[in-house]
Every structure is written in structure tokens, then in C-alpha cells.
Amino acid sequence: MTSVFKTGGLRVEYDMKVPMRDGTRLSLDVYFPNSDGDDGPWPVILIRTPYNNQMPSVVTQSATFFAQHGFVVAAQDVRGRFDSEGEFTPWVNEYDDGFDTVEWIGSRDWCDGNIGMHGPSYVGNVQWQAASMGSKYL
């Protein structure tokens, strides 16, 4: 179930469930900019992490910063981690899951069709894996 929280002019929808091609659902928290009457669509920054999509130092601080500057930020727990379904096997599902997530976000009415990815370490590597799949939105 998705929950909505508003803080500092931002709206955050927690625990959206994004379906993967095999039916596994991955948890996505989405930070929306202060719209001031603008209902989007907006460019999106995607962060896919095995470290918890609500981790203050890597995810929530970055998400808040980018949302305050006009981006939607979508932070996802990778397969088998935290609120996402499935089994976590490092690197194995990141190509397909990254592509499926990008395609799902790209089809949302709040996305303007432009998606970038952000993050270091494992989070940075999954960007390359997703990008190699050739989504028109990246």
C-alpha cells in the first residue's frame, strides 16, 4: 500500500509497487517537487539501491535536494532488499529490473519522458546495467 507524506513543500509517495517482467514487485518511493500549481510532468532522477531507499545519507538527502530543484526523484529498493519482493542475488537481475523500472516510470503521467540515474558504488553500477538495455527514456 502506498502512503503519502508532505514535508517542506514536497510530496512523497512511499512504497509504490513496480511490476517486473516476471511478476516480482519492487518498492519505489517517489519525491515530487513543490508544484506551485504546476502538476508536471517533470524530468525524473532514478536511484536504485540495495542499501535501503530511505537511507538518509545517500537517498533521502539527494532526493530532497533534486525535488526542491524541479525533479521527481524515484528511489527503489532492488530485488530482494528491504520493501522489494524477490531474492537478492548481486548483479543478476539489475539489467532487466533496471530497464523495466525505467520503462514503468517513463510511462507515468508525472514523467516528461526524460530519466537520469544517480548514485555511487553499487548504485552507480546498476545505472550502467540499466542503460545498456537501450530504453528510450534514459
Locate predicted features.
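Primarily recognizes the serine-hydrolase "nucleophile elbow" in alpha/beta-hydrolase
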Residues: 47, 103-138
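N-terminal cap/lid segment of alpha/beta-hydrolase-fold proteins
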Residues: 1-40
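Conserved SAM-binding loop
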Residues: 18, 76, 119
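Conserved G/P- and acidic residue-centered "switch" motifs that form tight phosphate/ATP-binding loops
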Residues: 23, 80, 119
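Cap/lid segment of the alpha/beta-hydrolase catalytic domain
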Residues: 14, 34-107
